[in-house]
Amino acid sequence: MKWNPLIPFLLIAVLGIGLTFFLSVKGLDDSREIASGGESKSAEKKDANASPEEIYKANCIACHGENYEGVSGPSLKGVGDKKDVAEIKTKIEKGGNGMPSGLVPADKLDDMAEWVSKIK
């Protein structure tokens, strides 16, 4: 019995196409997790119960510093003396001038703005 020499190449091509299709479908399934940065629903529940200080440590410390002194973002010390709570809330909510928006859950904006205004 004589085999066609193209059969091994054909089998490899079919296997490659099948593997590519499978990995593409798998990637689409994982896209939601990738888009959320790997956070699960339990992380969302944790954020809902987080204190302003915990939210700060999770989202703000990289730019505003461990002691609120400012790193790449401005210092938060005494910001309550310069701006009222409503202005601080708007800044946290909408961002601007290099600050991203949406870092604080909407239901925690008032608590966070009040907390930031009291930093001395």
Swiss-Prot record:
Binds 1 heme c group covalently per subunit. Gene3D superfamilies: Cytochrome c-like domain (1.10.760.10). The keyword Transmembrane applies. This is Cytochrome c-550. Keywords: Cell membrane, Electron transport, Heme, Iron, Membrane, Metal-binding, Transmembrane, Transmembrane helix, Transport. Pfam families: Cytochrome_CBB3. Not essential for growth on minimal or rich media. GO terms for cellular component: plasma membrane. Residues 26-120 are periplasmic. The chain crosses the membrane at residues 5-25. The gene is cccA. It is a single-pass membrane protein. Its main location: membrane. It comes from Bacillus subtilis (strain 168).
